[in-house]
Amino acid sequence: MSRQQIGVVGMAVMGRNLALNIESKNYSVSIFNRTRSVTEEVFNQNKKKNIVPYFSIKDFIDSLLKPRCILLMVQSGKATDETIKMILPYLEKEDILIDAGNTFYKDTIRRNEKLSKYEINFIGMGVSGGELGALNGPSIMPGGQKEAYKLVLPMLEKISAKFKGEPCVSYIGPNGAGHYVKMVHNGIEYGDMQLISESYFLLKYLLNMSNEELSSTFSKWNKGELNSYLIEITKNIFIEKDEKGKYLIDRILDVAEDKGTGKWISKSALDLREPLSLITESVFARYLSSLKRQRIIASKILQGPKIKTFIKDKNSFIEEVRRALYLGKIISYAQGFSQLKRASEKYHWNLKYGEIAKIFRAGCIIRANFLQKITDEYTQNKNVVNLLLTPYFSKIANEYENSLRNIVMYAIKYGISTPTFSAAISYYDSYRALYLPANLIQAQRDYFGSHTYQRTDQTGYFHTNWSQ
């Protein structure tokens, strides 16, 4: 009996497309799905391809060359644990199990530890690019046993996205490192999307720009510093029309949903004591948008500015928004990469930040030209503390901070919500501040809780019996 080179479990759209991607690179693929009809459907649609369906987990695993390589693309959480439990009795030492789902990194750490006891290699692999990326080439973030990674690297390089011929895949680190980086990627994606949405609202409601004008503006932006996948699709979204010839964007309900993964990075930030303010505000912005009924009521009760909109120079304002958006994006990445550094230190992952930026350059949702700037900065200095302190990004920050400040002032003046722009300038001012009002907070803590404080003129910790 001929055996296949790799098996894929989970035939929803992502698993299906990854299987097809792998097969297209001259690999033979076994497929399995708990629901028999789904497996049959995938096979029947691809009979001419080197894909072999199996309907029992034992037959599926027996069909694979040793050491077996099995890729899981199932729902994260309980479903992944149940699938591993189902597969485990049939696995042998040195087999490789790859979890390519959108998995919480602590689950990956736990599973890696458990499977290591059986001498089974477990790779937690972040995959970005959506269903089309899975089919045509995603950005891939594998973490786990390095020796196992080396065995699957030839396949991963072939199926990954390419940036100027360079595969967008690199070994991230041990156990949960790959899924942690994917989590940070998702958080940056949240931040990017919210910043772009706030830019759209400022242009639409302060300049009364039409959808055609918005599309044209974003098209120009996409030819410069802001060149990215998200800017590219946004310019297309503005001019998409429905079956009645109406602009679709104007008929989409203003409620942004999420799959719950956005909050993971914010929870981790709190655990690590990392000020991930912009990205966390982008998560909260989605939650606030979901309060649609309450917002309708509030719009009739709570007052805002009643002054008439007046922007003297339209082109100058558009440029201010562009600059604010670029600096906001930089601050978002600065926060995300700062958190990666803190997590790497805590979990002893030894992350390579320049390599991480490189694999984001193609295939993934946050792909953008400016990622090369991040790679360049880490190439010149492997001990970057914060991207805002590097030569290129500090230069941009100093040139663009006034635009970011002006945009937030305009938003406040005219009552337009800009949570991530506001978080960006607040973080920027706090981060560059020689002094913050935290001395008063520490005095208050000592006053009511005897928590002590440090002094600027003496070493050690002090407590005062404050006057009542």
Swiss-Prot record:
Pfam families: 6PGD, NAD_binding_2. GO terms for biological process: D-gluconate metabolic process; organic acid catabolic process; pentose-phosphate shunt. Substrate binds at N102, S128, G129, G130, H185, N186, Y190, K259, R286, R445, H451. It comes from the Bacteria. Its EC number is 1.1.1.44. SMART domains: 6PGD. The keyword Oxidoreductase applies. NADP(+) binds at G10, M11, A12, V13, M14, G15, N33, R34, T35, V74, Q75, S76, N102. Pathway: Carbohydrate degradation; pentose phosphate pathway; D-ribulose 5-phosphate from D-glucose 6-phosphate (oxidative stage): step 3/3. InterPro entries: 6-PGluconate_DH-like_C_sf, 6PGD_dom2, 6PGDH_C, 6PGDH_Gnd/GntZ, 6PGDH_NADP-bd, 6PGdom_BS, NAD(P)-bd_dom_sf, Pgluconate_DH. The active site is at K182, E189. It catalyses: 6-phospho-D-gluconate + NADP(+) = D-ribulose 5-phosphate + CO2 + NADPH. SUPFAM superfamilies: 6-phosphogluconate dehydrogenase C-terminal domain-like, NAD(P)-binding Rossmann-fold domains. The keyword NADP applies. Keywords: Gluconate utilization, NADP, Oxidoreductase, Pentose shunt. GO terms for molecular function: NADP binding; phosphogluconate dehydrogenase (decarboxylating) activity. Gene3D superfamilies: 6-Phosphogluconate Dehydrogenase, domain 3, N-(1-d-carboxylethyl)-l-norvaline Dehydrogenase, domain 2, NAD(P)-binding Rossmann-like Domain. Homodimer. Belongs to the 6-phosphogluconate dehydrogenase family. NCBIfam families: gnd, PRK09287.1. Catalyzes the oxidative decarboxylation of 6-phosphogluconate to ribulose 5-phosphate and CO(2), with concomitant reduction of NADP to NADPH. This is 6-phosphogluconate dehydrogenase, decarboxylating. It comes from Buchnera aphidicola subsp. Acyrthosiphon pisum (strain APS) (Acyrthosiphon pisum symbiotic bacterium). The lineage of its organism: Bacteria, Pseudomonadati, Pseudomonadota, Gammaproteobacteria, Enterobacterales.
